[in-house]
Amino acid sequence: MASNKVSFFLVLCLCILLAGECIESPIFTGNKCSDPTGMDKDGKCLDYCHAQGYPGGSCIGFIDQGYMCVCKVG
């Protein structure tokens, strides 16, 4: 009975670790977006993220900082 609990716990931990790999994590670059409305019309944020090796990026609004470039992972 104890070995079943240990096996269940190990499988549960493995599932949690694998699920964490699939979640997109944003990478905050600290670069302000040039467009005050938050649109990446000129593609600078996307180009920056591609140059850094990330698959994508976009401008996301923050209350205290305005729109910032955020790269996507995964």
UniProtKB/Swiss-Prot annotation:
Signal peptide range: 1-22
Q: List keywords of the entry alphabetically.
A: Antimicrobial, Disulfide bond, Fungicide, Plant defense, Secreted, Signal
Primary location group: secreted
Subcellular location per UniProt equals:
Secreted
* Keyword Nuclease listed: no
State the disulfide connectivity. Answer: 33-59, 45-69, 49-71
Listed GO biological process terms? defense response to fungus; killing of cells of another organism
> Which terms in the GO cellular component ontology are assigned?
extracellular region
Q: Please indicate if the UniProt record lists Signal as a keyword.
A: yes
Membership in a protein family: Belongs to the DEFL family.
Its name, as the record gives it, is Putative defensin-like protein 36
